[in-house]
Regions:
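Rossmann-like NAD(P) dinucleotide-binding subdomain of oxidoreductase/dehydrogenase enzymes
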Residues: 101-205
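N-terminal Rossmann-like NAD(P)+-binding subdomain of aldehyde/semialdehyde dehydrogenases
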Residues: 1-108
Length: 205
């Protein structure tokens, strides 16, 4: 019998290390790179529209295809169009006022920059919307993402895990389902930013 090395990094830790190294190698992706990522995400949604609806229905026990399209799929597609339209402006430096009495002749600028690796904890309700819409703005901002799905979204998580690697490399995006206490470990990872949708009580755990 071979014993596992307790000091060996977990799959989550390895994923974070991979993405952080990729971020440090290319910390400020170009406008063209970000647009390409957004179009790739939109292509994934369009090419798997029916599969996304089927996965949601399986996870819910039953859910109207029209509800999923109207509440989740179409808003995600439209959100990407919105980001593509405004991305160039979002990336431009923004001027800020200066206290001219103390800093006469000085100028201020805020330069938008990626933060690095962003974690996303997705709830069971509206999980397509609450995973793909955050990814839209994570990629628009030039970041990388690790996504943890709900234990009640097994079919959707499996769809993501099976299909998304054909669209994004692991150093850009990885998705995890809720197995073996993944949620607790995921929430404790030292992300550069963490997005969580849920109750305040759960968020404090």
């Amino acid at each position: 019998m071979t014993l596992a090395d307790p000091s060996a990094p977990s799959a989550l830790e390895s994923a974070l290390a991979l993405q952080r190294a990729a971020y440090l190698a290319d910390p400020v992706p170009s406008l063209a790179r970000r647009r390409a990522d957004l179009r790739t995400l939109q292509r994934f949604i369009r090419e798997h529209k029916q599969a996304l609806c089927d996965a949601i229905s399986a996870d819910y026990g039953h859910r109207s295809r029209h509800e999923t399209l109207l509440a989740e799929i179409f808003p995600a597609i439209d959100g990407i169009d919105h980001a593509l339209k405004h991305l160039r402006g979002w990336m431009k430096p923004q001027r800020r006022a200066v206290d001219w009495r103390n800093f006469f002749g000085a100028t201020n600028r805020v330069i938008p920059q990626p933060v690095g690796v962003v974690g996303v904890i997705v709830p069971w309700n509206f999980p397509v919307n609450l995973s793909l819409v955050p990814l839209t703005y994570i990629f628009a901002a030039g970041n990388r993402a690790m996504v943890k799905m709900s234990e009640n979204s097994r079919h959707l998580a499996r769809l993501y895990i099976d299909k998304l690697p054909a669209y994004f490399p692991p150093e850009k995006l990885q998705v995890f389902d809720e197995t073996g206490g993944v949620g607790v470990e995921f929430s404790r990872l030292p992300f550069d930013h963490l997005l969580f949708t849920g109750s305040g009580a759960t968020g404090r755990l």
